[in-house]
């Protein structure tokens, strides 16, 4: 057994189904190399069955079922409401976060925060949960996780949910999330599970020499696959098939006494809302890059809602519609705002939303099927909360208006974070379109940033979550080395 790093004495894993075989293999290596105490948290009996079947005796030191944020919040509260609220405020003060911010991260009980997704399917959780139930559940969750961290002396947590991520931050316990780098098939180990950041990246970039080749933008393969699947759902026949499949599944769940989660009618309405809203979009005068030729423009990349990268990683950000309105208001004369919808968001938006966008005289609604990378190349600047377009713009030296305080590229000189005070957005736009950003330096810095990000990443190869044999040994070794290296230059202290 090798010398045991402090951060690997006792490791907790919050079960992530898509990475289950990969993380199981990783836990085996940690146990073999360091004798790490392994504590696993699953969110259903199905998770328990997985480890009972695939984990050998002695690998896992403890395993237990715990609830996701919205699970159990439907239990009626019958106690002293004043005491309940006082305890909630005490916990908020201790951890420096409001319960409402945590609620945002759940697509069920936090659906009210997704202002541009009123047509997202409703669920049993969203409809049967009241505010007191949320307070009761969160009070219990914070007590549970603080007890777990202390009693099991956890040194690191992998894939934390939001509440354990907040507790880990407060107790000084490092966390790691496997996060897509957005370069080819690369992934990296993100820090700070509360917001999923990578603070060491700036120091890594400082060691990347100048003179890196310009970045050639390319769409990663999974995006193309997902895009084809989304477009296939825009047909009426597919809507009928999806509805039939859902009805059978819903009936089987009811017959066996299981919860079906989403409401039957709400899901059916969503399936048929997809082709209906797609046709609503296609009937509008959609812009092309040829229409924008010769006109400087800001590219606003819309994102789907609800979405983890918005509500979890950027809870401080305003709703997308507020930023769109603000930028359209503050643009200099002659500059347009080009808005491109995320293909997954179609069917969720309010009725008439796209038609209303065309009422802005300085806004161009782009064809959603336009390749995003082409729009990034042509734009004068990119405005986004957390979309891939922000990374692409940063890599090729385009000015980026970052609307998230937690984006990995925020430290770059050609990235601007608007001041929240009046005039903040206007000042940023004036900087960009008055030529105050050194575009040659921006392109050089962007290429170095790209190289640094690739340097802390690894390729997971042909891994398929349903095929344990698809995990290649050399890929596992690469991933584990990257995991261990992430602690060497990280900012978090190890628990004593």
Regions found by a protein language model. Name each.
Residues 13-24, 308-312:
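A short, glycine/small-residue-rich beta-strand->loop->alpha-helix junction that serves as a flexible
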Residues 33, 39-138, 183-274, 278:
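Conserved N-terminal ligand/cofactor-binding loop architecture of enzyme catalytic domains
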Residues 117-129, 324-366:
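Catalytic donor nucleotide-activated moiety binding site of glycosyltransferases and closely related
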Residues 135-150, 307, 319, 343-389:
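Donor nucleotide-activated moiety binding/catalytic core segment of transferases
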Residues 138-202:
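Conserved nucleotide-sugar donor-interacting segment of glycosyltransferase catalytic cores
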Residues 155-160, 165, 175, 179-181, ...:
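A donor-sugar binding/catalytic signature common to diverse glycosyltransferases
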Residues 197-249, 414-496:
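Leloir-type glycosyltransferase catalytic cores
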Residues 291-326, 335, 341-344, 451, ...:
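Active-site donor-nucleotide binding/catalytic segment of nucleotide-sugar enzymes
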């Amino acid at each position: 057994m090798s010398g045991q790093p402090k951060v690997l004495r006792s490791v907790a894993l919050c079960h992530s189904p898509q990475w289950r075989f990969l993380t199981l293999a990783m836990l085996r290596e940690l146990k073999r190399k360091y004798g790490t105490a392994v504590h696993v948290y699953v969110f259903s009996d199905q998770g328990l069955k997985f480890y009972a079947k695939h984990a050998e005796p002695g690998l896992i030191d403890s395993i237990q079922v715990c609830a996701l944020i919205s699970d159990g919040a439907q239990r009626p509260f019958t106690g002293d409401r004043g005491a309940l609220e006082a305890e909630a405020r005490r916990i908020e003060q201790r951890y420096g976060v409001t319960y409402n911010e945590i609620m945002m991260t759940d697509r069920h009980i936090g659906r009210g925060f997704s202002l541009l997704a009123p047509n997202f399917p409703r669920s049993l959780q969203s409809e049967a949960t009241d505010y007191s139930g949320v307070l009761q559940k969160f009070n219990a969750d914070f007590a549970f996780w603080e007890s777990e961290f202390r009693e099991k002396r956890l040194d690191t947590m992998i894939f934390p949910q939001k509440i354990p991520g907040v507790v880990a931050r407060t107790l000084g316990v490092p966390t790691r999330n496997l996060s897509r780098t957005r370069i080819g098939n690369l992934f990296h180990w993100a820090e700070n599970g509360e917001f999923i950041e990578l603070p060491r990246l700036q120091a890594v970039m400082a060691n990347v020499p100048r003179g890196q080749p310009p970045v050639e933008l390319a769409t990663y393969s999974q995006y193309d696959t997902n895009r084809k699947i989304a477009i296939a759902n825009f047909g009426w026949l597919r809507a009928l098939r999806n509805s039939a499949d859902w009805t059978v599944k819903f009936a089987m769940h009811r017959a066996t006494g299981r919860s079906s989660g989403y409401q039957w009618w709400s899901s059916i309405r969503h399936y048929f809302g997809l082709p209906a809203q797609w046709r609503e979009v296609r009937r509008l005068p959609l812009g092309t890059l040829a229409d924008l030729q010769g006109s400087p423009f800001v590219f606003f990349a819309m994102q789907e809602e609800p979405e983890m990268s918005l509500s979890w990683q950027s809870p401080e950000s305003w709703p997308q519609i507020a930023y769109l309105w603000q930028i359209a208001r503050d643009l200099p004369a002659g500059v347009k705002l080009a808005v491109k919808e995320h293909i997954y968001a179609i069917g969720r938006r309010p009725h008439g939303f796209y038609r209303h966008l065309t009422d802005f005289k300085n806004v161009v609604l782009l064809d959603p099927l336009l390749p995003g990378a082409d729009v990034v190349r042509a734009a004068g600047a990119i405005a986004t909360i957390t979309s891939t377009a922000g990374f692409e713009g940063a890599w090729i030296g385009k000015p980026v208006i970052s609307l998230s305080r937690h984006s990995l590229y925020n430290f770059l000189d050609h990235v601007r974070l608007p001041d929240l005070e009046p005039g903040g957005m206007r000042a940023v736009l004036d900087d960009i379109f008055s030529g105050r950003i050194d575009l040659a330096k921006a392109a050089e810095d962007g290429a170095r940033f790209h190289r640094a990000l690739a340097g802390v990443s690894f390729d997971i190869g042909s891994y398929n979550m349903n095929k344990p044999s698809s995990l290649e040994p050399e890929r596992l070794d690469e991933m584990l080395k990257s995991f261990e290296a992430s602690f060497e230059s990280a900012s978090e202290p190890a628990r004593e």
